[in-house]
Amino acid sequence: MALAVIAMAAYACSTVPLTGRSQLSLVSDDQINPAAAQSYRTLLSDPSTKVVNTGTDAQRVKRIGNQLAVAIDSYLKNNGYGSQYNYQWEFNLIQSKEVNAWCMPGGKVAVYSGILPVTQTDAGLATVMGHEIGHAIAHHSAEALSQQMAVQAGGAAVGAATGNKSQTTQALIGTLYGVGGQLATLKYSRDKENEADRLGLTFMAMAGYDPRQAVSFWQRMAAQNQGAPPEFLSTHPSDATRIANIQRLIPEAMKYYKGK
């Protein structure tokens, strides 16, 4: 068992853009992105999902999302990561009272209308979208799958890591994301949350949004939470810790900010 885990760890490691962190990578984009895209389409086509296609808010989500995507794609290409990412970006607004947003592997983004009163401004919306996109760019879900496979260290898991990918990978993705298009938001460790904050701040700065405005968004989120974070933040750092970390990261992000 131990030898299998060591062999798999040596078999595939990757580096997170910008942060330079090494991570276990037994699941490729070619494996996880199509499954994520299918889950995204299933969710959006579900009769209970109310996708907003018209109006100012829907246009804002798509506009800011596309600005982030252009900036991110340019950064990845210019820094030697272009061949590792082939994201087919999509940005949709979902009508819901839920205070939520997420980005699935491959760049499939959803913003729930319930979070818009908290974002308030374009910079606020860029903050939360940049953060969720940060999880995807850092391959946090693929890393979680890889860690599950390493723990299992069985024939099926090794097979998925070395090419027999369809059934096992789909099953593991189902475990993380739920079955039948019902998205179960991934719960990341605090280290992953901090990494997504760092990436998100930089991405919003690259897209022309002042990363200093992220502090205001998280302060509004703290007031919204009233001590009880929404489900998608349930394993995130405390509000005070996150805001302090963001303030510490702002000088780095400002290096990429040129304004609009």
What is each stretch, according to the model?
Residues 1-260:
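A Zn2+-metalloprotease active-site environment signal
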